[in-house]
Amino acid sequence: MDQAGSSVEPEARYFESDGASYPNNPNLPVLIYRGIFNSNKGSIADQFEESFRRNRWTGCWRWSVYDFHHHHSNAHEALGVSQGHARLQLGGPQGEAFDVSAGALIVLPAGTGHKKLHSSTDFLVVGAYPNGQGHYDTNRCGSLDYDQALANIAATPLPNTDPVYGSEGPLVRIWG
């Protein structure tokens, strides 16, 4: 196991396509890990960044989540909640809302619609992508041909590692 300690088993959620603008991922579930890190070991943002780097998830950024529905058809995305709390809509407009707070990790397979519904003022996310997927697209409703989105999703390689737990982590087992 990696430095995060014994692994937290994620909640796995599948979302169906709307058949038009939000393909979601026909084969892979969203993974929601809760309580991955806490502030007892320093900055949660720093812990996520170190873990992502160690496990070859690259292109790290710190910010929030867009407040409009969007998806990335050519990259998987890890969102490490580092501060505050939020309600996120996953799966596009027909999806489901989830409450997340500091220490949670959401891993979105390519094509999964997502947006921020509301958040605390201090809400902060560290985002990252599997090695080689840092040049991702951002698609809003109807901005990418649906068939092209499906082709991009199918062509997006699986990551070799879980963003926190490495090559033996839950993502590798569940998505593998």
List each model region and its residues.
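A short, N-terminal "cap"/entry segment at the start of jelly-roll beta-barrel domains
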Residues: 1-70, 171-176
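A short beta-loop-beta micro-motif enriched in histidine and acidic residues
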Residues: 64-78, 93-94, 100-102
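Short, conserved beta-strand element in jelly-roll/cupin
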Residues: 72-89, 107
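A generic structural motif
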Residues: 89-91, 117
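Conserved metal-binding segment of the jelly-roll/cupin
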Residues: 100-120, 129
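Double-stranded beta-helix
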Residues: 117-176
